[in-house]
From Swiss-Prot:
Subunit relationships: Homotetramer; dimer of dimers.
UniProt lineage: Bacteria, Pseudomonadati, Pseudomonadota, Gammaproteobacteria, Pseudomonadales
Species of origin: Pseudomonas putida (strain ATCC 47054 / DSM 6125 / CFBP 8728 / NCIMB 11950 / KT2440)
Catalytic activity: oxaloacetate + H(+) = pyruvate + CO2
Name of the molecule in the record: Oxaloacetate decarboxylase
Similarity comment: Belongs to the isocitrate lyase/PEP mutase superfamily. Oxaloacetate decarboxylase family.
Length: 289
């Protein structure tokens, strides 16, 4: 079977956006997981920013990974991927000019699409970790991203955190990003179908949801009718890999103590030590959670 080119995969992603169906992402974090996802029939994969931070730095999701580190991992995946890969490009690694550099590098890495979010990252002195940038700045980032791409088949998706906004504020932001030319809108933190319906009726571009398995949004047919084309349930595959590695090595060492039989969540916490970063952010930056 002939291999798909990067542009082929970008067109395949656009076909998903143009379809009438809803597709769930596979969490791909290295070349092997990308090959597995494609072989199992997943239509789309995602390289999450949080997962890249774990994989490359063994660090929690505090915007610590650099653009070059993220691009290197995306490039490794892009060499072998035979499914469209969506890159979670966080805040674009800086201002609108940095966003342009991010788009250039990720396009060369071979991703099919990328998200740019409007969270104020990295955390700023004296601000909340969930604060958003002004909508005007977010619009500038989307416009800059569109200007920077060479291959027009690369999809640029604007992302916002619905969990920290009123429904009215979500509508204003998402409509602004749609008007700026975003190929799709990604939202994290949508509570339920009632809220989604209120937002969706104001938008015409395809939608992407990061649900983390929210039980109030588990109806693919209903999601599809509301324009949702991509759903990110989370990154279970990555955490399962951590758990499998731990269990295998623990068995090799003959450590059968039940107290050491940790869950994937416990393992992630143990080996990334997020409480240290929270303490440092509060102590050195006066960042409020």
């Amino acid at each position: 079977m002939p291999k798909a080119s990067h542009q082929d995969l970008r067109f395949a992603f656009r076909e998903l956006l143009a379809s009438g169906s809803c597709f769930h992402t596979a969490s791909v974090f290295d070349p092997m997981s990308a090959r597995i996802a494609a072989d199992l029939g997943f239509e789309v994969g995602i390289l999450g920013g949080s997962v890249a931070s774990l994989q490359v730095l063994a660090a929690p999701d505090f915007a610590l990974i650099t653009l070059s580190e993220f691009v290197e991992q995306a490039t490794r995946i892009g060499r072998v991927a035979q499914l469209p890969v969506l890159a979670d490009a966080d805040h674009g690694y800086g201002n609108a000019l940095n966003v342009m550099r991010t788009v250039i590098e990720l396009e060369r890495a071979g991703v099919a699409a990328l998200t740019i979010e409007d969270t104020l990252l990295p955390a700023q002195f004296g601000r909340k970790s969930t604060d958003l940038i002004p909508v005007e700045e977010g619009v500038g980032k989307i416009r800059a991203a569109l200007e920077a791409r060479v291959d027009s088949s690369l999809s640029i998706i604007a992302r916002t955190n619905a969990g920290v906004l009123s429904t009215e504020e979500i509508i204003v932001r998402t409509q602004s990003y749609q008007k700026a030319g975003a190929d799709g809108i990604c939202m994290v933190g949508v509570k339920d179908f009632e809220q989604l319906e209120q937002i969706a009726e104001h938008l015409t571009v395809p939608l992407m949801l990061v649900t983390y398995g929210n039980p109030n949004l588990r109806d693919d047919e209903r999601l599809a009718r509301l324009g949702v084309r991509i759903v990110v349930d989370g990154h279970a595959a990555y955490f399962a890999a951590i758990k499998a590695t731990y269990d295998c090595l623990r068995l090799q060492r003959g450590r059968q103590n039940k107290s050491e039989n940790l869950s994937a969540t416990e393992l992630s916490h143990t080996y990334t030590q997020p409480e240290d970063y929270i303490r440092w952010a509060k102590e050195y930056m006066s960042v409020e959670e």
